[in-house]
């Protein structure tokens, strides 16, 4: 997986030519900026698949295996010794091949799309994708329906996450974690360059003192969402003109060199090392690192969810459902959070376990957000077919 890429003249040209991106992006390969623009045209706005996912033979009864592809920083101890994952393996007898190669939704989906379109196995039994991409998989018939009899703990799902537009009733997906996109800074470097200890707005990223020391996320809904919110727009109900105004800002900052990189999870090592001073950033990546700080802009943060799906033709569907059920047990969900996965758990009843293991962590609004905190967040709207064509 490409962790991050410099904005080359070629990729900058792609941004300048956004209106022609459908033809230009055909040969864009893995350029992060191209992935960003492609995200503008990816939607999954219905909960009924246009085609039925191909179901392969479930070998779970004879093969105690599970291959799980996830994002980095989403498992306590990255699934190693003493983690919740090893507990699941011991309790279930299932050997889990757990990998963290998902850097952004588009890059990962592109890596398996050919198999999915040809109705060939991807080799994965669980993949974790953000709402909008999960919707695309479901709509395209790339995800298998869940057997809820194998997941009785799904009843513990946060009620607000049950009836989502892309999967009403959660027949194909279950949330893994939710989180927020705001602004992360390297405290020492940011203070040295700006003389400030905190950042209050997206506009603060455009300070000339930070030129070339800024990155933005390749997740279009987060970066464009934050910019539109800074312009006073509601990202749950914006117009094409609103989107184009925000895109014009981003174009200008890329063309001027203010923005150094467009990146997925690869921004984090750069932020930790001080190569960059600030970035649009995901809450759980930055929270807990004493050298970094994460801020909700005054205009608000975006709120998103990453979801577990079982790909079409997965070989170990029942084993995958057993893993989902394990992590929806409140005690296991609490151990996962207490182990360092500082995102919003989809299992609010995990809080007593977290309180027992780490009382301070249980007070963290980035894990158990209050209604007041959530009031300053927005969820990016589901794109219509027309908007999909326009963007």
Model-assigned labels for residue ranges:
Residues 1-19, 30-37:
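N-terminal secretory signal peptides
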């Amino acid at each position: 997986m490409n962790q991050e890429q410099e904005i080359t003249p070629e990729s900058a040209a792609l941004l300048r030519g956004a209106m022609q991106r459908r033809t230009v992006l055909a040969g864009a390969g893995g350029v992060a900026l191209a992935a960003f623009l492609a995200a503008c045209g990816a939607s999954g706005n219905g909960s009924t698949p246009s085609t039925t996912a191909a179901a392969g033979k479930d070998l779970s009864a004879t093969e105690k295996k599970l291959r799980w592809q996830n994002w980095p920083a989403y498992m306590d101890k990255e699934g190693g010794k003493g983690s919740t994952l090893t507990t699941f393996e011991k309790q279930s007898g299932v050997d889990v091949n757990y990998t963290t190669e998902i850097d952004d939704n588009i890059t990962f989906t592109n890596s398996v799309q050919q198999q999915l379109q040809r109705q060939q196995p991807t080799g994965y039994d669980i993949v974790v994708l953000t709402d909008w991409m999960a919707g695309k998989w479901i709509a395209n018939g790339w995800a298998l329906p869940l057997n809820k009899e194998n997941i009785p703990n799904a009843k513990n799902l946060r009620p607000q996450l049950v009836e989502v537009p892309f999967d009403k009733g959660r027949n194909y997906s279950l949330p893994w974690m939710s989180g927020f996109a705001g602004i992360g800074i390297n405290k020492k470097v940011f203070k040295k360059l700006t003389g400030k200890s905190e950042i209050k707005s997206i506009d603060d990223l455009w300070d000339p003192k930070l030129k070339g020391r800024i990155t933005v996320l390749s997740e279009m809904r987060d970066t464009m969402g934050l910019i539109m919110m800074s312009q006073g727009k509601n990202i749950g109900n914006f117009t094409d003109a609103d989107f184009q105004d925000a895109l014009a800002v981003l174009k200008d900052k890329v063309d001027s060199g203010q923005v150094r990189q467009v990146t997925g999870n690869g921004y984090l090592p750069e932020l930790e090392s001080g190569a960059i001073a600030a970035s649009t950033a995901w809450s759980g990546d930055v929270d807990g690192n004493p050298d970094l700080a994460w801020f909700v802009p005054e205009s608000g943060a975006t709120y998103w969810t990453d979801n577990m799906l079982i790909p079409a033709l997965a070989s170990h569907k029942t084993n995958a459902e057993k893993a989902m059920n394990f992590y929806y047990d409140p005690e296991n969900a609490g151990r996962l959070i207490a182990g360092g996965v500082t995102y919003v758990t989809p299992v609010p009843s995990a809080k007593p376990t977290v309180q027992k293991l780490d009382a301070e962590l249980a007070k963290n609004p980035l894990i158990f957000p209050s209604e007041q905190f959530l009031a300053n967040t927005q969820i990016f709207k589901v794109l219509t077919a027309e908007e999909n064509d326009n963007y």
